[in-house]
């Protein structure tokens, strides 16, 4: 095994690519599988597949030769954008022309607005709460039975998705229907705190209360969106309950944790408002993307981050010999997913289009392609690989060390929960530097202990969304209720004085005209 052959993700090296459309055509024809996909073999029509994904969220290719990832299963290198490689693979595999129109969005809300304004896509990749919303609104096409057939060689998703992720998708429901019926995972992660260990202790970084900790006045950042901010607030205000032995040892702990972290009662909203207003007065900034740069520049010593962005931040800082850590709050962490779904308005009962859409999802889920995407963007794929060890070998390629290394404090880092579904599986124990438990490895693949205290934040219905947004407006706008009385007196006096000066000026002006 090699020590930290990890390099900075390609995302850190590439220019921002947003809203671009790419397409390549190849000749051919096919039929796929059985059942739903008995497509006419002699149909020469080109299938146009419209895919909309997050910005910088798929391998765009153009790797240098020295970026080649050398694994036991073979070398991996990205030459072309993955969606172009899919077109060629689809033709080679199914002998059918397909043209991919690839475009991007910046936020879930932007995607939803695009759909509401009439933009039509076949496959999109929203986050879990937007998937839930689209399911509730009956906007999605369910996967075919063929998609779940593990005997089909090309069904890389169902054969390779992590047992941990698969369980989450099969046990969470909207209106009595599981996520897995409509969504296939793509990337996943947790939320936590990136911090400078020279300035902040691990203990301080391991609680959501750091956002209001006066010792870090104007030296910590918080996410500038209501969902992430509200989750942190709930974790902080319910901290004593969530970390109590009685709560943790309850047989229904996970269900209770999800209930508490999704508490949208008026009382909880009021407490969250108070906490977030205190946070606003303490943090350096509310941010969406600038927090990474602020951490790397030293403007702040801690920042609320998604684990994928945490890996990017740690990578970039390390390039300058500046070492940061990642901690997951003890109260709870938000388990998030981005996943592929098919839209009714795009697919429109077109069997050939659905065939291509499901094949695209399978293609990006092939273990070597999962590695390409992880390397390029820095986030963690939901793919563990099943019987294919490519993903675990890539993990070892990045973080593995020789267990006899004398210059490294070596530890065993068990990852069976993700790769096989058995937390104690000896086949999936990584030998690594102990520091990595609190650095990139711990962010990319959190420990089983961390995942045990994770919770999925569900989507807000119309009424809940209105209530949460009202609360958020009070957080982000200046709260006049907190203005001291003496300030109001000064304001009133100033207004009266200004009016008096104005009136006096008018009187003088009139008297001058009379003269």
Where are these regions (language model features)?
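Short beta-strand and adjacent tight-turn residues that come in two discontinuous sequence segments
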Residues: 105, 125-126, 222, 286-287, ...
